[in-house]
From Swiss-Prot:
Coiled coil: none annotated. Kelch repeats lie at residues 139-189, 190-237, 239-289, 291-335. Keywords: Kelch repeat, Repeat. InterPro entries: F-box-like_dom_sf, F-box_dom, Kelch-typ_b-propeller, Kelch_1. It comes from the Eukaryota. CDD domains: F-box_AtAFR-like. This is F-box/kelch-repeat protein At1g67480. PANTHER family: OS02G0202900 PROTEIN, OS02G0504900 PROTEIN. It comes from Arabidopsis thaliana.
Length: 376
């Protein structure tokens, strides 16, 4: 999502740690007495899991309140696998919207048809900018950022998780380094954060990885230069960082930093974009909008690191703001400025030329800040 550049003295938000039940050590969970009880009396647990997997996703919070063992199953990665094998996975779109005054925001939830389902409980913690959102194991993570507390700008290391199955928020382990305006993406079930601004507003080159199994953050090899205002995407098991600025460039950086998660090392090329205001991955391609012109989008093919340009069917100002979403393998284009009056557009990359753009019936209650798609 778009991050905001902030200046001035920063300090770390240091709240008390609070870990959710779903993040406790697996061994300790299995040792509890409730794990010895059958999921459904009279049925083997494997069969019972298949029965539970047939329940519509909207009923998961109710299932999780039946008993501790049902809650444990609904939260597990295995349950997603069982639902996939049963052909019961449902794709939902989560959109963070903001009202016209820019003071209140909320997450709206829509099903695979774009029908509005509900709103999420309010995000915990103070209102922040410069944070990032990412999805891992069917859960939504809101990471770090910067906020105003008692008149001071505060760089945060907080990480909050929304469990889409239980409709609840919990606190995860803090980042090793408080940061905002950084790059973030999920690669092979792990979450990576790179660069950004730190506690005193300094530019960062450090990078960290989060392991959901252990609920821990660990440093990885740093970038060769500090970088901020950037974004990240994942392709073929690699982390691609581009856009933003660097201490070693005049203006915006076109450098593309690529992290090989298998080798644990970085390499770079000069084939990235500069100031990207919106991006989304659909299939094996990355779609971006540059801040200079919102009437076209640049499409990145990670296989050969090449770009192509696709025109947007828009009129009016070329600086009108937009944010991306994706649903059912198609790209959604939301207005990030409520007053523009733009409708939601849908782009099908697999459709024949001339038929790729359509108007979507999806309507948001405010302007779009960011969005993610979660399948469970």
């Amino acid at each position: 999502m778009q991050a905001f550049a902030l200046s001035g003295k920063k300090r770390i938000v240091n709240h008390g740690m609070c870990f959710s039940k779903g993040n406790l050590d697996l061994g300790s969970r299995l040792s509890e007495n409730f794990m010895d009880d059958p999921l459904i009396p009279g049925l083997p647990d494997d069969v019972a899991k298949q029965c539970l997997a047939l329940v519509p996703r909207a009923r998961f919070p109710s299932m999780g309140s039946v008993c501790k063992k049902w809650r444990f199953v609904v939260q597990s990665k295995e349950f997603i696998t069982v639902r996939r094998l049963a052909g019961m996975l449902e794709e939902w779109l989560y959109v963070l919207t903001m009202n016209a005054g820019g003071k209140d925001n909320r997450w709206e939830v829509m099903d695979c048809l774009g029908q509005k389902l509900s709103s999420l409980p309010p995000m915990p913690g103070p209102a922040k900018t410069g944070f990032k959102v990412v999805v891992v194991d069917g859960k939504l993570l809101v990471i770090a950022g910067c906020c105003m507390i008692n008149g001071s700008l505060v760089a945060s290391a907080d990480v909050y998780q929304y469990d889409t199955c239980l409709n609840s928020w919990s606190r995860l382990a803090d980042l090793e380094v408080a940061r905002y305006d950084f790059a973030c993406a999920e690669v092979n079930g792990h979450v990576y954060v790179v660069g950004g601004h730190g506690v005193d507003g300094e530019s960062l080159s450090s990078a960290e990885v989060y392991d959901p199994e252990t609920c821990t953050w660990t440093f990885i090899e740093s970038l060769r230069r500090p970088r901020w205002g950037c974004f990240a995407s994942a392709f073929n098991g690699k982390l691609y960082v581009m856009g933003g600025r660097s201490n070693f460039t005049i203006g915006n950086s076109k450098l593309l930093d690529v992290y090989n998660t298998q080798c644990g090392s970085w390499h770079g090329s000069k084939n990235g974009l500069t100031m990207v205001t919106a991006h989304v991955e659909v299939g094996k391609k990355l779609f971006c909008i540059d801040w200079k012109n919102h009437r076209k989008m640049s499409v990145f093919n990670a296989e050969d690191e090449t770009w192509e340009v696709v025109a947007l069917p828009l009129s009016g100002s070329s600086r009108a703001g937009f944010q991306f979403g994706k649903l059912s393998g198609k790209l959604l284009l939301f207005s990030s400025q409520e007053e523009t009056g733009q409708c939601t557009l849908l782009y099908d990359p697999d459709a024949s030329p001339g038929t790729q753009w359509k108007t979507s019936e999806i309507k948001l209650s405010g302007s779009c800040v960011c969005s993610v798609t979660i399948t469970a």
